[in-house]
Regions:
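Mid-domain alpha/beta scaffold segments of enzyme catalytic cores
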Residues: 1-368
Length: 368
């Protein structure tokens, strides 16, 4: 889930290099990361907001908030208003107990900022790692965020990249006559070795009206073809469009590893996913009290097809719904999933990690 970004940038080596430099300023390379002496020790204490996420550590003498570093190019900020138009609680939730077995957050947006302080990607990765989220997939929704994903994956081995044009962005690009150019850019980026998925792509009939359906469907088909061409996984954004998503996947031929990001279907879609071998990735929405269909799908899902994600900074799990989200919060979602499936937490974590590596390949770090 992310909003469109209007600017399109020509894919040149100079621009890629500049974005890689940006990511290095946000996510240092592994050697720099391990050698750095971090202020406050970035302690993670159960029941307390992790130190990098605590605004009181970044107050100036006037009481104003101070960002850890300038946000700069490549980052955007989530609205401080909720869907109901009211101000949200911008305090990050407390840390849970670390997971018994490290897993993957297979869909997150580190470039989208939220909360009282700006969290560097390095600190987000460190906090997640301490709480059992050992690796992530950074997901693009347009050309700038896809370039950011590639640069972040180059800069830190805990990150792999997914690249795409979001379905809500596709109609605007089609109207501007630049959709094909954007797809050509993705085709070039897909050759990067740490790009492991095309996504998030798909169909969204909730935010885009009938006038945008044709462009969304054309874009979705082209993304499927890109994933197949490059042998990459496909991450699908599917909102109120289950029937057409399934139809187009079957018509085009779904990639071997097809993932329904932030799974939102019910029993019938779960049955189809089980039959086709498509993965179901569960976000914080599975914990919501009104998500009975998603919870039923979780119970139905074949174990080898289950993944977990945050879609951070969105979709924070219950009981912190509406507050800022980050990869460490996958921990809460997975605990709910284990309880709901009546499965041991350790077994579920091992299963999610194995499934994630099967879909995306190796991160090149121990255990992943």
């Amino acid at each position: 889930m992310c909003q469109s970004h209007p600017e399109q940038t020509e894919l040149t080596q100079e621009y890629l290099d500049s974005l890689a430099a940006l990511a290095h300023s946000t996510v240092p390379n592994e050697q720099e990361l391990r050698a750095s002496a971090l202020p406050h020790g970035w302690q993670v204490e159960e029941g307390q907001t992790p130190a990098p996420y605590r605004a009181e550590l970044y107050r100036d003498e006037t009481g104003g908030g101070i960002a850890q570093e300038p946000s700069g190019e490549g980052t955007r900020r989530r609205s401080t208003k909720g869907d109901n138009g009211r101000s949200r609680n911008l305090v990050f939730p407390p840390a849970p107990e670390p997971l018994p077995y490290a897993i993957v957050d297979n869909h997150t947006h580190m470039d989208l900022l939220d909360g009282e302080v700006e969290i560097t990607a390095r600190d987000a990765l460190d906090t997640g790692e301490k709480l059992g989220i050992g690796a992530i997939v950074q997901v693009g929704c347009d050309i700038p965020s896809s370039l950011y994903a590639v640069a972040a994956a180059r800069a830190d081995r805990r990150v792999l990249a997914a690249i795409a044009i979001h379905p809500n962005t596709a109609p605007d690009l089609e109207s501007a006559g630049t959709l094909d150019e954007a797809l050509e850019t993705l085709d070039a980026l897909a050759a990067e070795p740490r790009v492991r998925a095309i996504g998030e792509t798909g169909l969204d009939y909730f935010r885009t009206g009938e006038e945008g359906v044709e462009a969304q469907q054309r874009s979705f088909r082209e993304h499927i073809r890109l994933a197949r061409k490059h042998g990459l996984a496909l991450q699908i954004h599917d909102r109120q469009a289950h029937d057409d998503v399934v139809r187009i996947l079957l018509e085009e031929g779904a990639p071997e590893h097809t993932v329904f990001h932030c799974y939102s279907g019910g029993a019938e879609l779960a049955r189809i996913c089980n039959e086709q071998g498509w993965y179901m990735s569960f976000a914080g929405t599975v914990t919501f009290k009104n998500s009975k269909d998603i919870q039923e799908s979780l119970r139905m899902a074949r174990p080898e097809l289950i993944l977990a994600e945050t879609d951070a900074p969105f979709l924070t799990p219950h009981p912190f719904r509406g507050r800022p989200n980050a990869s460490y919060m996958t921990n809460y979602t997975v605990r709910f999933m284990a309880a709901h499936r009546e499965q041991s937490l350790e077994d579920l974590c091992q299963m999610i990690r194995a499934n994630s590596v099967r879909v995306y390949g190796s991160w090149g770090i121990e255990g992943f």
